[in-house]
Amino acid sequence: MKPSILEKLQQLGDRLEEVTHLLGQPEATSDMDNYRKLTREHAELTPVVEVFQNYRLAQSDLADAEEMLSDPEMKDFAAEEIEAAKAKIDELDTELQKLLLPKDADDDKNIFIEIRAGTGGDEAALFAGDLLRMYSRYAERNRWQVEIVSANESELGGYKEVIARIVGLGAYSRLKFESGGHRVQRVPATESQGRIHTSACTVAVMPEADELEDIELNPADLRTDTFRASGAGGQHINKTDSAVRITHLPTGMVVECQDGRSQHANKAQAMKVLAARLNDAQKREVQAKEAAERKSLIGSGDRSERIRTYNYPQGRVTDHRINLTLHKLDFVMDGDLAEITDALIAEHQAELLAAMGD
């Protein structure tokens, strides 16, 4: 293990002792905000320090075993102990490096997921609907809630564009690598000749800002328009100008919300989406620089990148970033995404570990 990492681990051990002492003081709960902060820090530090203690114990076992090598009667036993200790050290070394990987502060947040139909017209819109169902079913498997924030439906079904909010612990950590181009190859329902068509959708996954204060929104930078909602909403919603369109003038970003029951509700939701988009734009700029340094294809934030192909005739799903192909398309489209998301997270961790070793 690198000396710099050992030094960092020693510092974390010292800090855990300090935090434990502070939490044990009689006045610790007088400032509840600080108390919660210390409790959270204690919970984060404890597993790292415990593994480091086991690492040092394994090193001590190795040293003891090496001393026994000089005793002819203990030589065979010592060799076995050395082999076991070295294997344990390697295992704990890898575990420690993973624990030291920089945490994404957004991982536990709720998300907004935007799905836009691209090339392929009506077929792309139908596929956008299929993707929404896929993510909704995945959310159900994780006991997350799904809310439709805004939807622009196409004439034959599906969506030209749809924004959903997914509420649940870890939603961003599991779905953040879904951003990018999704391509589908299949025979459309409207195709009489049985020819396979290729269509595409773009998916954007954005963490929900904790509060609007997370990002400064100058009222002078915003233009708010109201208009009559259309689509599913009933007679009530069509009689009033309840739909809201907010334009962020410096960037040209436009957010529309019309699925709420009032103008106030739609404006509040639109502001949340806008804050998430602006935060996301800043985050992607940083990610792009970091990914370029790592020569990474995962987590680059590049929305134009084609990340996955869904081939219906072959029942195949291929994620191009990690060359993963699964022949279980029906299961994936029904929300069985765990194998894909786990593989993407593992590859991302491997890239970060490699960067730490440079």
Swiss-Prot record:
Primary subcellular site in the record, as a coarse category: cytoplasm
Disulfide-linked positions: none
Domain of life (superkingdom): Bacteria
Cross-referenced InterPro entries: PCRF, Pep_chain_release_fac_I, Pep_chain_release_fac_I_sf, Prokaryotic/Mito_RF, RF-1
Pfam families reported in the protein's UniProt record: PCRF (PF03462), RF-1 (PF00472)
Modified residues (N5-methylglutamine): 235
Xref: SUPFAM superfamilies: Release factor
GO terms of molecular function: translation release factor activity, codon specific
HAMAP family referenced in this protein's UniProt entry, alphabetically: Rel_fac_1
Function: Peptide chain release factor 1 directs the termination of translation in response to the peptide chain termination codons UAG and UAA.
Listed name of the protein: Peptide chain release factor 1
Gene giving rise to this polypeptide: prfA
